Amino acid sequence: MVALLDVNVLIALLDAGHMHHDAATEWLGRHLDEGWASCPLTQNGCIRILSQPAYPNHAPAAEIATRLAEAAQHPAHHFWTDSVSLLTPGRIHWPRLLTGRHVTDAYLLALAVENQGRFVTLDQGVPLAAVQGAQARHLVVLEAATRTRR
């Protein structure tokens, strides 16, 4: 299955100093032949976060965009348009979303389901049951690193 990479996974891949860089790189290396995907939301989020002065290893937005564009040129990359709406009746089981912080995760999971792929994230507690048609195979939560990178 093609893997839609969450913003946090894209950041970990692009920032060699990120505490989850090794875990993200290792996972993608093992699954690259299945393909990976990004979408406007994940691309924008990656550029926004990595270019913020408050981010420890920040860089200018143009530099981050160039690096992300280079990664997206890889033959295994798929670009998924924002083809789903959370407002489509039945797409989201709203009572299963306990907090607003899960809305973006639910959207990206729904996009993965729509594209017959899987959503790969570092986030714990992604509400699988909140997305119509989502099954365990549609979600991969990477194990977080337990040590700080230097």
Each language-model region and where it sits:
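Short, well-structured N-terminal submotif of metal-dependent ribonuclease cores
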Residues: 1-38, 50-66, 131-134, 145-149
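Proline-centered loop/turn at the N-terminus of a beta-strand
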Residues: 2, 35-37, 78, 118, ...
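Acidic catalytic patch
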Residues: 16, 37-44, 66-97
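Anion (oxyanion) recognition and catalysis
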Residues: 32, 72, 113
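Acidic, PIN/NYN-like endoribonuclease modules and their adjacent C-terminal/linker elements
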Residues: 85-98, 109-150
